[in-house]
A protein has these predicted regions:
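Glycine-rich phosphate/adenylate-binding loop and adjacent beta-alpha elements
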Residues: 1-44
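Mid-domain Rossmann-like dinucleotide-binding core that forms the NAD(H)/NADP(H) cofactor-binding site
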Residues: 42, 49-131, 136
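Structural detector of well-ordered beta-strand residues that form the stable sheet scaffold
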Residues: 45, 82, 105, 126, ...
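Structural motif
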Residues: 56, 84, 107, 153-154, ...
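Glycine-rich cofactor phosphate-binding loops and adjacent beta1-alpha1 units
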Residues: 73-75, 111, 115-196
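Short strand-turn motif at the edge of the Rossmann-like AdoMet-binding core
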Residues: 154, 176-180, 200-203, 226, ...
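C-terminal hydrophobic helical "lid"/dimerization subdomain
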Residues: 161-165, 205-255
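Rossmann-fold dehydrogenase core element
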Residues: 172-174, 185-224
Length: 255
């Protein structure tokens, strides 16, 4: 919740409020672990009948994050996108980009996640632990040039560095994973290859609407991102599993 009137709030970016965010639901304000949730009506996006509430939850956080990054990258069909980290955000990026005709290279150290990425449309999958030289492996898949764009959804310093190094000249890298650090050679990794580095944090209400419409129109199976379902009284169990970061995405039903 922002001031509601500044340049960001008035364009659907309340989380970037010039005066500072007044309330963050689930952090400084009440969250959604209840049957109902009170929030500003002007932040809501009405879901179409062909989108489940479960998919809607993903669109608001996770799938929407991927959508925001892909939108910033301005990808075209037949270009190559390398996605580092295949949690819910990374897998969503694979699903959305693949549906746009983008050739996706999906990267993760977890074979189960790599297999899911393949089922969501990734053309190639790579496990960094099984590659002697990951950058060369990506170049081998792109006629020696490198990827047109990359998304890092892992927060791993090494993956972030690789997501830049794997790009061709004029490539674009987008970081969406929170926290962590990165070590890059500004001249060789960025300037002398004309690389664009983008930071993308969430997206606007209007972006949320566009994402929901696209998913419905393309009939993307966002529900398949979810691997677990719980009731509200199972929240403790849900968070214990979540902390292990070993599975996909879960949803808690309030009723």
């Amino acid at each position: 919740k922002g001031c509601g009137t500044c340049v960001h709030c008035s364009t659907g970016w309340q989380q970037l409020c010039v005066d500072g965010v007044k309330e963050v639901f689930g952090v400084t304000g009440h969250g959604a672990h209840a049957k109902y949730m009170k929030c500003p009506a002007n932040t809501l996006v009405k879901l179409r009948e062909d989108i489940s509430f479960k998919s809607g939850a993903a669109i608001s956080c996770g799938t929407g994050t991927a959508w925001g990054a892909i939108d910033r990258l301005c990808l075209r069909s037949h270009e190559t996108l390398a996605v580092f980290g295949l949690g819910p955000v990374g897998l969503s990026a694979v699903m959305i980009a693949s549906s746009m005709g983008v050739n996706v290279i999906a990267l993760d150290t977890n074979q189960k996640r790599l297999n899911r990425a393949k089922s969501f449309g990734a053309v190639n999958i790579l496990n960094p632990l099984k590659s002697d030289n990951l950058i060369d492996a990506i170049k081998d898949l792109t006629k020696g040039l490198g990827a047109h764009a990359s998304i890092d959804a892992s927060s791993s310093p090494e993956a972030r560095s690789q997501s830049i190094k794997c790009l061709r000249t004029w490539g674009k890298a987008c970081f969406v994973g929170e926290g962590g650090d990165v070590n890059i050679d500004v001249s060789n990794d960025l300037l002398r290859r004309q690389i664009t580095l983008i930071g993308s944090w969430t997206f606007s209400k209007h972006g949320q609407y566009a994402c929901a419409e696209y998913i419905a129109d393309k009939k993307l199976k966002v529900d398949e991102l979810f691997t677990h379902e719980w009731k509200l009284n199972q929240a403790k169990e849900a968070y214990e599993l979540f902390d292990k970061q070993s599975d996909g995405k879960g949803v808690i039903y309030p009723s």
